[in-house]
């Protein structure tokens, strides 16, 4: 699979208080494409970030029901991937920020 398709699999990293505490354990969270599989995500993370992936956990997040101007709607369903890296590897999301 070419590298540009790997960039389509990973939507965006999840940067919250909970995921920053997970990064201390070498675990990083991403929103990914809803058709992504564990093996292709592992290859994509390894090629894009040049790290060694130990394990990938995937979970589907159901969209919440929200109200807007009296009309009830739902947010989109998402797929979340929690990636565990090998011991000496890490991903720096804020590398160029000073």
Curated annotation (Swiss-Prot):
Gene3D superfamilies noted in UniProt: 3.30.70.330
Keywords: Ribonucleoprotein, Ribosomal protein, RNA-binding, rRNA-binding
Keyword Ligase assigned: no
NCBIfam families: PRK05738.1-3, PRK05738.2-4
Keyword flag Membrane: no
Matches recorded under SUPFAM superfamilies: Ribosomal proteins S24e, L23 and L15e (SSF54189)
UniProt protein name: Large ribosomal subunit protein uL23
Single GO BP term: translation
Cited function: One of the early assembly proteins it binds 23S rRNA. One of the proteins that surrounds the polypeptide exit tunnel on the outside of the ribosome. Forms the main docking site for trigger factor binding to the ribosome.
Oligomeric and partner information: Part of the 50S ribosomal subunit. Contacts protein L29, and trigger factor when it is bound to the ribosome.
One MF term in the entry's GO annotations: rRNA binding
